[in-house]
Amino acid sequence: MREKIAALGLDVGKKRVGVAGCDGLGLIATGLTTIERTHFIADVEKFKQLVEERDIKVLVVGLPYSMNGTLGSQAKQVQNYATRLAKALQLPLEYVDERLTSYEAEEQLKAQKRFSTYNKGLVDRQAAAIILQQWLDQRRSLRLIELEDNL
């Protein structure tokens, strides 16, 4: 029997954090909510509720690399926030390269005729879903490679 996948995908911004979850099989990521950042302790309480409700085992955070592959100041701020959050929630933390996910999220929402410049939270949730989906797809690919190697 396959292990249940219980991950939260996060698109961390200065004002908001887009949050995504996935089905238990780890096939499909879906945007769940957007958390308006206030102060860190209040943010942690909001995340604790999600972690308990969904029995989360890992945080997957998008890391905004520069186009040349380096970590800029925004990426370092995301790392700092994510590290503190993972420690407060006592969860392991994994990163995914999130270059252009907000752009991709906007394009997906436009294609679905759901995009609005007034609803930034929707874009944040969609970006979080893209981040988590990348992580799920990478895990699945690695598992397939391991299976092929064992044949």
UniProtKB/Swiss-Prot annotation:
Matching InterPro entries: RNaseH-like_sf, YqgF, YqgF/RNaseH-like_dom, YqgF/RNaseH-like_dom_sf
Matching Gene3D superfamilies: YqgF/RNase H-like domain
Keywords: Cytoplasm, Hydrolase, Nuclease, Ribosome biogenesis
Gene Ontology CC entries for this record: cytosol
One annotated GO biological process: rRNA 5'-end processing
Enzyme Commission code(s) on record: 3.1.-.-
SUPFAM superfamilies: Ribonuclease H-like
Superkingdom per UniProt: Bacteria
Main localisation: cytoplasm
Subcellular location as annotated: Cytoplasm
GO MF terms held by the record: nuclease activity
UniProt cross-references to SMART domains, sorted A to Z: YqgFc
Pfam family, one: RuvX
HAMAP family: Nuclease_YqgF
Function comment: Could be a nuclease involved in processing of the 5'-end of pre-16S rRNA.
Similarity comment: family membership: Belongs to the YqgF nuclease family.
The protein, known as: Putative pre-16S rRNA nuclease
Originating organism: Gloeothece citriformis (strain PCC 7424)
Taxonomic path: Bacteria, Bacillati, Cyanobacteriota, Cyanophyceae, Oscillatoriophycideae
